[in-house]
Amino acid sequence: MVGLGVFARKFFGSAHERRLKVLRKKAEQINVLEEQFQKLSDTQLCKKTDEFRKRLVEGETVDLLLPEAFATVREAAKRVYDMRPFDVQLIGGMVLHDCGIAEMRTGEGKTLMATLPIYLNALEGKGVHVVTVNDYLANRDAETMGKIFGFLGLTTGVILHDLDSDARRAAYACDITYATNNELGFDYLRDNMAFDRSQMVQRGHHYAIVDEVDSILIDEARTPLIISGPLEDRTDFYNLIDTFIPALTPEDYEIDEKQKTTTFTEVGTEKIEKMLEQAGHLKGESLYDIENVAIVHHINNALKAHKLFVRDKDYIVRNGEIVIIDEFTGRMMPGRRYSEGLHQALEAKEHVAIQPENQTLASITFQNYFRMYRKLSGMTGTAITEAEEFSNIYGLDVIEVPTNLPIQRRDEDDEIYRTAEEKYRAIVRDIRQAHEKRQPILVGTTSIEKSEQLAERLRKEGITNFRVLNARYHEQEAYIIAQAGVPGAVTIATNMAGRGTDIQLGGNIEMRIRQELQDMPEGLERTAKIEEIKKDVKQLKEKALAAGGLYVIATERHESRRIDNQLRGRSGRQGDPGRSKFFLSLQDDLMRIFGSNRMDGMLQKLGLKENEAIIHPWINKAIEKAQKKVEARNFEIRKNLLKYDDVMNDQRKVIFEQRMEIMNAEDLTEMILEMRNEVVEDLVETYIPSGTYCEKWDITALQEELHQLFNLELPIETWAKEDGIAEEQILERISNAVTKLENERIERFSPEVMAYFHKAVLLETIDTLWREHLVHLDHLRSVVGFRGYAQRDPLNEYKTESFELFQAMLRNLRRIVTSKLMRFEIIQQPIEPRIPEQTDVGDPILNDQNKKNSSTLWTPSQENKFVNPKDRNPSDSTTWGKVGRNERCPCGSEKKYKHCHGAFV
């Protein structure tokens, strides 16, 4: 059978080859249209957009429009930028349109390629999201590619970190929106915490193209997006615990670098117990008594912070704050914080201000966020090694798009040394040799610390003309990358994965124009200078080519082969020559943690001397085996995370859909009535179980519950003494009494007031209980793994118990909402004749009547002066001034003020 399979592949081609053959035929159809579209005027070409939209309305599909739409974009790109998408870019665009992942080598024009499917799918008017890894790339691509879309009559928006809600809403309303994965995810979570539909910014999830798709959907898949709020301040306790760790010795704890965990030994536990006892914080006799659970958590975090997390590798200290470094891209991630007290432990370790711990308010993983899109696709330079994961988790096929020109880069064999010192001596020697012939060099390191150590070595060797690109200097990233291809340039970079910028030999013309001519106005002089820059870059490129092209030197193998391939792929863009080489040592993290312990002995037996390298197929296979082992482990972690998050995701969908229904509903009376009836039925069933005798009824408890929930005093004891009374009759009487009380409240407060309160109480209660539920799920997730020791499947246990917690939350929701709506009171504040002082009371706060003060709804006070209606902001009541009771409400509801916002004043 194997022989037949091999024969079939040779005869018919692989599935990948057959797919490319079909796509090439489609590309030919587009090429046939090129001459026809060249003859169109700019106006005629622009009108194609309206023509395509009309045809879609009449029933045509985007698939049928593809050849003409792609031909339109190709012609627009030629006219706007004098850039013509190659056939391979047409193929890549079709892969993206068909919900696939296009693997294209660095420098092959992914950004321009993406304009083809973006335009085609934007014609439907449902929004296209283009996802990038950072704000710089989102802004750059929106600005440059937006000119092509603008030429064709489409609107382009960009979401940046510091935009307010109105600007975000406007950007999402555009035909095409560029944004980072983080901003998209957080906007989705914030939308599902909004009080009103008008506060939401996104408009759905129709089609997304993810740039650097492997970085976002693979590398970052393990990290959930979390919106959190502060808990109590425990600064002193964190500082105290932090003082314990330096007193420990290596025999007091164990570190598993492979699993990234730390544990105390028996000796270490005894030491910690003594220190806690002296500080007066040990409860009970043992550290592991139930009363000390929180303390154990803090101590484990402190140990992890000191022994597992390395400054300038995992994080940096910047402006008195701990800033996390992305392990895959080497970029800083400002605003991101480790959860569960780990970030506070790092702050205590580095003696910076400790921020309060946070409580999760809402969370989602990128895996579940991006699976919400009706159409999803991606592009990257390296995806084949992760093809199985893309297919299993996202249902995306990876297609390797051919290069426009053959690759001329020479990938040399790895050089393996016994020690890191020998390795770095060899790297410096190689850099010197290449630098002397003016070959541009890119050196890839795995951490800030190692990049700066290498920089210091180069200085000592007299090589000073180099640049360092790491998280410390990320603001200069674009410029450093742009100049990395200049002859004689030496660039030391931390993790080139996901940089999104290719290195052009001779330098980047656009960057030089921006840098050198930023203050020069348009005119003949500027045009002449631009021509000079172009000529200079051309000459520099010729020199770089003569020196052998870009030389990529890697100082370590990464855990993932894909990251190594990304670094290699920086050389040899668009058919340019180049070379790459990896320098390794047995002291590298990958070799030390995952490699074979016998490798060092084997090298010694082979007679390896100091400063000698070994190049052997057996060594290369061992390295690849170690990398595959790590990749498999990380894949399992991500799959496992998804299984657990899928459980929460099902519950999240229910809650978010319920919130959306409440926000959109004009009348929630039926929902409230249904909740109230279920609460009454549950109460009666609990204290007067069906089919039981009166002697078994707990009348006292039922009366207490009715008083607590509804503020009702009913003669249930008297009813229970009636001859032949049944639980159904008592249920009916209680229901009638509750309905009567509710009707009285409606008469007192008007339907508008009740509608507002129904919505406010429902949303506020759902949000509060959902936050608490997330905490419960976090706790359950952290301990459920131990069920495996009892021969029970942790995942099944998690599913069962999380469902029970969810059902309990829904029951609690019904009780709390019913109780609040049956007990609230409004205190009307009389308007004094004098102009009151301005008071910023904030958002409405609903207090429970059982508290010291009676229940009160507060709203921002209105300043007692008249304001021109044109100057009033409908969404900001503080700008309305004095509003007449019979005027139309400034909010835009078309109701009279006294029946709308004026009802609360």
Curated annotation (Swiss-Prot):
InterPro entries named among the record's database cross-references: Helicase_ATP-bd, Helicase_C-like, P-loop_NTPase, SEC_C_motif, SecA, SecA_CS, SecA_DEAD, SecA_motor_DEAD
GO MF annotation list: ATP binding; metal ion binding; protein-exporting ATPase activity
Topology class, membrane: Peripheral membrane protein
Top-level taxonomic group: Bacteria
One GO term of the biological process aspect: protein transport by the Sec complex
Pfam family, one: P-loop_SecA
Keyword Cytoplasm: yes
GO cellular component labels: cell envelope Sec protein transport complex; cytosol; plasma membrane
Cofactor note text: May bind 1 zinc ion per subunit.
Sequence similarity: Belongs to the SecA family.
Function in brief: Part of the Sec protein translocase complex. Interacts with the SecYEG preprotein conducting channel. Has a central role in coupling the hydrolysis of ATP to the transfer of proteins into and across the cell membrane, serving both as a receptor for the preprotein-SecB complex and as an ATP-driven molecular motor driving the stepwise translocation of polypeptide chains across the membrane.
Protein name listed in UniProt: Protein translocase subunit SecA
Organism: Bartonella henselae (strain ATCC 49882 / DSM 28221 / CCUG 30454 / Houston 1) (Rochalimaea henselae)
